[in-house]
């Protein structure tokens, strides 16, 4: 029997089984009340964009949505929309799991040439973590550079620190705050008597960018699309609940599954555990050592048993990483089917994972080296619009 805990601050599947139990995303869809993403939506997106759908859509990594069909209607009718996502800076460098929503945003921005706002929740990390405010802000600035290195268009992208720039939409923060009573906040976010009042007030800040009126440079009435990890859904569910009272359009959202940490598919990768995460500044040999030593395998106890029964693909972390970072569908299928049949061993799966992750991180690091303070200023400058 497994129990899932999915909140913006805690993701884990607790089970009495010896083998880690993967997160049940169908259960999340039912629990959160969102809709399952389907191939028809991916096909329509592809038709409207004129570009092949990102493999995140094809592989079920984008697994759920809220009103994405209505967002596609907006696109079909040439009505404006924009993207919104965020990052909570808990470490100086992001890990590979943090890149997933941003890679999705990059695809959408490239496909539709649309504006993107990225919220850096340095205030949230200060309020929830044992962290100095100065450190949270410093991590935020470094994380902005990490994000810039992914290749966004500076003319279409605004990245902002909540501490430094949320005053630009303070009016909406106040309006949203007034619509949420304490009982509702406790129910949605799990606050209790130990929660500080800063934590209780924070959700209004994450909700505010869902509404185009928070940004003067975005057209009035533009619909917001939020690509995000599913653990952030409580914020956007509440945003949709309050939209009518605020006279705003409900935001649409698409949710990606959570990249597991190295030690098991039952929890997401966390920056707080260096042995369970692969950071974007990890050296090539460090990546190799982490995957070989720590990546949980679905292989059998002996090679003979593995050849006979095949590997357990559902709990194999190296294969999960291939799903996210190997863009060749045919090669991915070769490793999936070969592993299930026992033709590909756990060692071979890990070796392939090492190569793919090393290549991704190496390309990223070359881009990150080129990011300057001037680049950072170009992305955080609200006056450019």
Curated annotation (Swiss-Prot):
Catalytic activity: tRNA(Trp) + L-tryptophan + ATP = L-tryptophyl-tRNA(Trp) + AMP + diphosphate + H(+)
A Pfam family that the UniProt record links to this protein: tRNA-synt_1b
Gene3D superfamilies in the record: HUPs, Tyrosyl-Transfer RNA Synthetase
Span of the annotated motif 'KMSKS' region: 268-272
Alphabetical UniProt keywords: Aminoacyl-tRNA synthetase, ATP-binding, Ligase, Nucleotide-binding, Protein biosynthesis
PROSITE patterns per UniProt: AA_TRNA_LIGASE_I (PS00178)
GO cellular component: cytoplasm
Short motif ('HIGH' region): ranges: 89-98
Claim: Metal-binding is one of the keywords in the record: no
Enzyme Commission numbers on file: 6.1.1.2
Gene Ontology process terms (BP): tryptophanyl-tRNA aminoacylation
A Gene Ontology molecular function term of the record: tryptophan-tRNA ligase activity
Similarity remark: Belongs to the class-I aminoacyl-tRNA synthetase family.
Summary of subunit composition and partner proteins: Homodimer.
Protein name: Tryptophan--tRNA ligase
Gene source species: Encephalitozoon cuniculi (strain GB-M1)
